[in-house]
Design a protein with these regions (language model features):
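Short, low-complexity disordered leader/linker segments with a strong preference
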Residues: 1-36, 59, 336-338, 385-388, ...
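C-terminal lobe and pocket-closing loops
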Residues: 29-31, 116, 261-274, 283-372, ...
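Extracytoplasmic "Venus flytrap"
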Residues: 29-52, 147, 198, 356-362
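Short, well-ordered beta-strand elements
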Residues: 30-43, 64-69, 90-91, 140, ...
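Extracytoplasmic/periplasmic substrate-binding proteins
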Residues: 40, 58, 199, 224-305
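Extracytoplasmic "Venus flytrap"/periplasmic binding protein-like
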Residues: 52-125, 156-167, 257, 267-271
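Hinge/lid segment of periplasmic solute-binding proteins
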Residues: 96-150, 173, 274, 279, ...
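Glycine-centered hinge/linker elements that transmit conformational signals in sensory
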Residues: 176-180, 212-239
Length: 396
């Protein structure tokens, strides 16, 4: 009986050991952290592409699930409401025009400690783009992409006028005059110019003007040149060219010259595939001047998943994520170690000097800018009064 008991105990011990070994061999299920990611929509192509990029991230980071959703409607209003309710996404788009305001409101997480801890290098970002998201010496986001303006010209009309692509203000006016004289733009104007400071401000920079001294002779002369092209009959606004923006005016043949960003290229390909046009560097005068329209991925100050959010944010803006993002040509890389697809050189050469699109009291100031510019163009409001109004708005 004693032998039987010993045998039973021995078998039991073996069974326990086997169970323990099996339990140890069985991998524990890793904890999965869900990170929310949001931005505005720029069309189905861009939304679908971002989802593909996110899917690639999740495959290489199985412990992080990314819940990507598009915020429809007015993005700024929607995000402001979410900030107030403390339920903003973990990672989200921040337009350069809003970066300073949101950082000062304390709704964006400063990234300095994450950069230091992970030894993340920011050296490959174009400095002018990265600096757009620096406030008080702190980085509040990494630029996910960008676009400056370039000059797009209907090459058929340019050839019919016997002209070459202009490089300077004087040449621009000369080419436009030749187009007008020869009537190559039937039912339209040689140049499309929007009543929008997002198109006129580069001309101020090109003439040595600044927003800090927006009432200077240099700024005044730049505005007079811009508006003067319209007054001389060489240009007009999109609404006068049966268009809602200059891209449509160019594509439909109502204008031969436009000043738009990289976003024009996929639009022309899908909407006006038969229009022959070329993309040339932005016009210049005393100097090169351009705007950098850029958007960051930033982290919510209230995020409950900050480490996982940082992992996503830094990957999306790193070389692997950004290479995937710009692969379709919908945007330009904000990193010098990621190549843009072909045909973008006219945009990329603006990287060293393009200035971030944004300024103090952005929402109110931008409204004043464009309302006054419209009044200057349509009802003869004095340029000096517009610049005085803008100066006051900038100061708050």
């Amino acid at each position: 009986m004693r032998k039987v008991s010993v045998l039973v105990l021995a078998l039991a011990a073996v069974a326990v050991a086997l169970l323990a070994a099996t339990a140890q061999a069985k991998p524990k299920s890793a904890k999965v952290t869900t990170v929310t990611l949001s931005g505005w929509t720029a069309g189905a192509d861009e939304d679908n592409l971002l989802q593909q990029v996110v899917n690639t991230f999740m495959k290489s980071h199985p412990s992080i699930k990314v819940d990507y959703s598009v915020i429809n409607g007015d993005y700024t209003t929607a995000m402001t409401a979410r900030f107030a309710a403390h339920n903003s996404p973990d990672v989200f788009y921040v337009d350069s025009s809003l970066a300073s305001t949101w950082a000062k409101q304390g709704v964006l997480e400063p990234l300095g400690s994450y950069i230091k801890k992970s030894k993340y290098s920011t050296a490959r970002f174009y400095p002018s783009l990265l600096n757009t998201f620096k406030v008080g010496g702190q980085i509040y986001g990494f630029p996910k992409d960008w676009s400056p303006l370039a000059m797009e010209i209907n090459t058929t009309m340019l050839s019919q006028a016997g002209q070459k692509a202009p490089k300077t203000w004087a040449q621009l006016q000369s080419v436009a005059q030749a187009m007008a004289t020869k009537g190559v733009v039937s039912g339209g104007k040689p140049i499309c110019l929007s009543a929008d400071w997002a198109r006129m401000l580069p001309f101020i920079y090109q003439n040595g003007g600044t927003l800090a001294n927006v009432q200077s002779p240099a700024a005044t002369a730049a505005v007079n040149f811009y508006v003067g092209l319209i007054n001389k009959g060489l240009a007009d606004t999109p609404d006068k060219l049966a268009s809602d923006w200059c891209g449509k005016a160019l594509g439909s043949g109502k204008a031969a010259i436009a000043f738009e960003g990289n976003w024009l290229l996929p639009y022309m390909k899908s909407t006006y595939p038969d229009t022959r046009y070329g993309v040339f560097p932005m016009i210049k005068n005393k100097a090169g001047g351009n705007l950098a329209f850029t958007v960051s991925y930033s982290m919510a100050r209230d995020s409950r998943n900050k480490q996982a959010a940082w992992t996503l944010l830094s990957w999306l803006t790193g070389p692997v994520g950004q290479k995937l993002w710009v692969s379709k040509g919908l945007a330009l890389p904000s990193r010098s170690d990621v190549k843009a697809i072909g045909g973008r050189q006219a945009f990329l050469i603006a990287a060293p000097f393009a200035r971030g699109w944004g300024f103090p009291n952005f929402s109110n100031t931008y409204t004043v800018m464009n309302n006054d510019l419209t009044a200057v163009i349509t009802s003869g409001k004095p340029v000096s009064q517009m610049l005085a109004d803008v100066s006051a708005a900038l100061k708050g």
